[in-house]
Amino acid sequence: MFLGMPTLTHEEQQKAVEKIQHLMSEGMSSGEAIQLVAQELREKHTTRESVSIVFDDDND
């Protein structure tokens, strides 16, 4: 699976982590929180440089 993710500064990464932790503290699952924050980041950074991420879905 390939995903385009924007490159983030350390500060942006830290804010994303804090937002995910906050959402989880309010009862959202970790997967949902990560998905929500990732989507927000993609929308916010549509014009910035991005990197391709490859997930190996094989469960050997």
Swiss-Prot record:
Domain of life: Bacteria
NCBIfam families, A to Z: PRK05114.1
Taxonomic source organism: Proteus mirabilis (strain HI4320)
Name of the featured protein: UPF0181 protein PMI1604
HAMAP family, per the entry: UPF0181 (MF_00507)
Lineage, broadest ranks: Bacteria, Pseudomonadati, Pseudomonadota, Gammaproteobacteria, Enterobacterales
Family stated for the protein in its record: Belongs to the UPF0181 family.
